Amino acid sequence: MAAERALGNEPVDVSAQKIGYDIASHDPRSGHLRFIEVKGRIDGADSVMVTRQEIITSLHEPEKFMLAIVQIENGFAREPIYLQGALQTNEPTFDVTAIQFNLKSLLARAEAQREVTQ
């Protein structure tokens, strides 16, 4: 929430609603809305679990969906690393409740996106 406010956005915590993301963040300059799913990862973590609903939201709203990976180092949260868009190319089957993603792969995808936009 603080990182979104620092960007000049107006975030709202919607995590209790279980709608496929944790934060709805409005950019008052552009009028755009961002759907942000936050995943905190401790030192040494090698994966991130993403629920079926979060994946479906990323597929249905790829231009709005962002995965924010917040790494926890020595008990302190680092700045979020954002990965925008669909997390995979297809919807999980109904018997899949969550998928484990490799953390290094997600961070590499986020870095590649950042390089393209700079």
Predicted regions and their residues:
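Mixed-charge (Asp/Glu-Lys/Arg
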Residues: 1-118
